[in-house]
Structures are given as structure tokens and as C-alpha cells.
Design a protein with these regions (language model features):
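Mid/C-terminal beta-alpha module of Rossmann-like enzyme folds, strongest
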Residues: 167, 197, 204-252, 262-263
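Core catalytic loop region at the nicotinamide-binding pocket of NAD(P)H-dependent oxidoreductases
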Residues: 177, 201-215, 294-300
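Glycine-rich Rossmann NAD(P)(H)-binding loop
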Residues: 58, 149-156, 178-189, 210-225, ...
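A contiguous, mid-protein "functional segment" used to position or interact
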Residues: 270-299
Length: 313
């Protein structure tokens, strides 16, 4: 589909003129298959989704159609391809797990049972992937994995009902930031952390299908913070004029209160680890947001942020 917000990072970065891009609806199998067959990909990263919890309460049918049948359609393209790809990664969410509100991070072998329509649709997407993997690719001819990523933040996100975009919008209006759930704990991480993990998983299973599996992708325990703490860090990074207030909603739809991931499997299998702690993550996010608000050079700021890859040294 077209980017769902105006502005959006795809347009701001001028990517349309720098890559082959096909706009379409993943629910439309015929159109998806035509684009898939034309591309003949060797590696497939499935990130298309309706990704907002609160939107899933407003339109659960669309959420399930997109997140469940969209996954079915994508895997049908893989199954029926004349030359199937060698590596497929389905990106789901940390919210696929049955949330017991306990202090431990969920592991990949925990029960999948998301509560709200968004989370549950992603649990279903996991099960669909598992079924296709067992039913049609048990010979390992196509290496298929899923990645269950924690809450992603960073510059260039303009979605509704997400904490960092809400913070930036408030700063643009010179208003106090309203926080709905300041005491909720989430595995927040900069967007480049999971993106690096996705590419790593896709590459390694392309080279050796024994790496195919199910992987949590999230921050270290020390960076699993409350939303209130996250916004404190945002305000510190932003500087003068940044402040927030608790705007809890009395009849808000259910959202998990405490959620953490155990990423031991990803770390031990690939030697992966997060590169930025939350304070540095927020500094990068605020820097990007200020460049955007001032009408600065977004592609140049993205290049600066991508120096992330050199931070591993």
C-alpha cells in the first residue's frame, strides 16, 4: 500500500527513485504473485502488516486479513514459485506470546496466544508459517524463520498511537507530551537493531538452512524500561521545553502492562547483541526528529545514523 502517513520516511528519503518499488495490497494474491514472480527473489523479508494495537480494536477484520491471510498469500507465492527463494523471514512481534505479566523474558518455546486482535493475528501468522514450513518445506529447500521483535523506535516514524511520534508531535506544537501508560514496561529498541538482526538471520540461513528457526529480537534487560522512563530520556535528549504528563484513559482497550523478551537464542546462535543502550538510542532518535522539524537533509541524517554499523568495532 501507499505509505499510511503524511509525512512518511519512504517519501522523505526519496527512495522511490532509487529502487524498484511496487505498490500493492498483500491481501490481493494475484497482484502479489505477479510482483513476486517478476522479481524472482532469492531472499524474502515479510514485514507487511497492520501494526497498531489500538487500530486492531477498531478494525479487527482488516487486521486479520492483512496479518494472517497476507502471510498465507506470501507463503503461497513462495510455495508456487517456479524457482523458490532460498531464505524467507517473517517478521512478527514480541506480542505473539501469551502474556502472563511476569518479570521474566519470554523464550521462543513459550505458548503463542496474543490477547488483542493485532497480537493474536501475529500469533496466527507464526502458526501459519510453522505449518507451511512443516508441510511444504520440510526438506529444507527453503529456509524459513520468524523474528519476534520488541517495540521499535527511531526517527522517521509518524504513526498514530505510538509513543515517540506522539512525543515529536507534541514538541512541534510546543505542548506537553501526553503518556497513556507511563508504568508499562516494554522491550524498546532502536529500529536499526532488529533490522540488523533480520539481515543477519536471512543471510545465515541462506548460507546454511540449519539456522532456520524462531528468534526473539530485543534489548538487554537493562534497557527494558517503562514508557515513563523512555519519555524521560526523550525529554533529556530534547532539552528545553520538553515535559510530559500522565494522561491515562479510564476506558482504554487492553494493552499488556509488562513485556520482556529473552534473546539468548539469537545471541548464542549468531553472536548478535544490541549496540546502543536506551540513552544513546534516544539521542539518535531526537537528532533525526530535529533534522526533520528544521527541514534538514533527511538522507544525510539517515547516512549518519547508519554509521551504526561501525559502532560494532
Amino acid at each position: 500500500l501507499e505509505p499510511p502517513t503524511t509525512p512518511n520516511l519512504f517519501s522523505l528519503a526519496g527512495l522511490e527513485g532509487k529502487m524498484t518499488s511496487v505498490i500493492g495490497d498483500i491481501r490481493n494474491f494475484a497482484a502479489l504473485k505477479a510482483a513476486f514472480d517478476a522479481a524472482q527473489p532469492e531472499i524474502v523479508l515479510h514485514l507487511a502488516a497492520q501494526p497498531i494495537v489500538r487500530d486492531s480494536y477498531k478494525d479487527p477484520r482488516y487486521t486479520y486479513e492483512t496479518n494472517v491471510m497476507g502471510t498465507v498469500n506470501l507463503l503461497e507465492c513462495v510455495r508456487t514459485a517456479q524457482t523458490p527463494p532460498r531464505s524467507v523471514l517473517n517478521v512478527t512481534t514480541d506480542k505473539v506470546y501469551q502474556n502472563n505479566e511476569w518479570c521474566w523474558g519470554y523464550r521462543e518455546n513459550e505458548p503463542l496466544d496474543g490477547f488483542d486482535p493485532y497480537s493474536n493475528s501475529k500469533s496466527c501468522s507464526e502458526l501459519v508459517t510453522h505449518s507451511y514450513k512443516n508441510s511444504f518445506f520440510a526438506d529444507g529447500s527453503v529456509a524459513i524463520s520468524t523474528a519476534r521483535a520488541g517495540n521499535v523506535i527511531g526517527g522517521g516514524d509518524f504513526a498514530n498511537d505510538r509513543i515517540i511520534p506522539d512525543c515529536v508531535r507534541a514538541m512541534a506544537k510546543e505542548e506537553s507530551i501526553g503518556v497513556r501508560n507511563p508504568y508499562s514496561t516494554r522491550p524498546y529498541q532502536h529500529v536499526l537493531e532488529p533490522l540488523a538482526a533480520y539481515l543477519l538471520i536471512a543471510q545465515r540461513q541462506y548460507e546454511d538452512n540449519r539456522y532456520a528457526g524462531y528468534y526473539n529480537v530485543g534489548p538487554d534487560d537493562c534497557d527494558c524500561v517503562t514508557t515513563g522512563t523512555l519519555v524521560d530520556l526523550f525529554c533529556q535528549a530534547w532539552g528545553d521545553g520538553a515535559a510530559w504528563e500522565n494522561r491515562a484513559e479510564a476506558n482504554a482497550p487492553h494493552e499488556a502492562n509488562f513485556l520482556k523478551l529473552d534473546c539468548s537464542k539469537l545471541k548464542s546462535t549468531f553472536g548478535w547483541k544490541p549496540r546502543w543502550h536506551m540513552a544513546e538510542c534516544m539521542q539518535k532518535t531526537v537528532a533525526f526528529s530535529k533534522v526533520w522539524l528544521s527541514g534538514g537533509d533527511i538522507p544525510a541524517e539517515m547516512d549518519n545514523c547508519l554509521l551504526y554499523t561501525s559502532d560494532a568495532a
